[in-house]
Amino acid sequence: MARYRGPRLRITRRLGDLPGLTRKAAKRSYPPGQHGQARRKRSEYAIRLEEKQKLRFNYGVSERQLVRYVKKARAQEGSTGTNLLKLLENRLDNVCFRLGFGPTVPGARQLVNHGHVTVNGRVTDIASYQCKPGDVVAIRERKCSKQLAEGNLEFPGLANVPTHLELDKAKLSAKVTGRCEREWVALEINELLVVEYYSRKV
């Protein structure tokens, strides 16, 4: 499944608040469509699917990418669900979003793709790059790059920077000190349901 580029509020009406996808709030609390307000009992599969979709849309990853992350999370020690969230949180586009360099994950991805971001002094335009402890993520030393980041930092998508990122606003750079702790994940998600969804598929 390709990356979603349609109306974002349509997604948040169906799945709830997705801080990585959009900062706008849906005016209606029920799903879109003719039967949006109808109350139906959802199956266990539907509930798991919904949690999986939350993860996909919030972090802006394709189905194929998410399957790869699930496999990586399984191969690591510890809880598969927590490992999965940490892998997604440490993507370069998401790190830029959490630092406030981009208003949303798609906005931060655009910064990365257009060459406005460096990692350890080198321009890195791969949004899926896994930031590691010790990496220094910074805005490129160009006027247009700095203006974009400074404008976004005035109105960040999320108020607080996670503890595994040490931000220097003056230098528009940050050091990655580790992996994101579970309590700093902004998305309201039951990651165990996502793991269960893929248990028979991967």
UniProtKB/Swiss-Prot annotation:
Q: Which GO terms describe its cellular component?
A: small ribosomal subunit
Stored InterPro entries:
Ribosomal_uS4 (IPR022801), Ribosomal_uS4_bac-type (IPR005709), Ribosomal_uS4_CS (IPR018079), Ribosomal_uS4_N (IPR001912), S4_RNA-bd (IPR002942), S4_RNA-bd_sf (IPR036986)
Q: Which domain of life is it from?
A: Bacteria
A Pfam family per the record: Ribosomal_S4
Residues of the region (Disordered) are: 15-42
Q: Name one GO molecular function term.
A: rRNA binding
Offer one example of a GO biological process linked to this entry: ribosomal small subunit biogenesis
- Keywords, A to Z? Ribonucleoprotein, Ribosomal protein, RNA-binding, rRNA-binding
Q: Which residues form the S4 RNA-binding domain?
A: 90-152
Recorded hits in PROSITE patterns, A to Z, give: RIBOSOMAL_S4, S4
Assembly, in brief, is: Part of the 30S ribosomal subunit. Contacts protein S5. The interaction surface between S4 and S5 is involved in control of translational fidelity.
Under PANTHER family, the record lists: 30S 40S RIBOSOMAL PROTEIN, SMALL RIBOSOMAL SUBUNIT PROTEIN US4M
What task does this protein carry out?
Answer: One of the primary rRNA binding proteins, it binds directly to 16S rRNA where it nucleates assembly of the body of the 30S subunit. With S5 and S12 plays an important role in translational accuracy.
**Family named by the database record:** Belongs to the universal ribosomal protein uS4 family.
User: What's the name of the protein?
Assistant: Small ribosomal subunit protein uS4
Name the gene that codes for it: rpsD
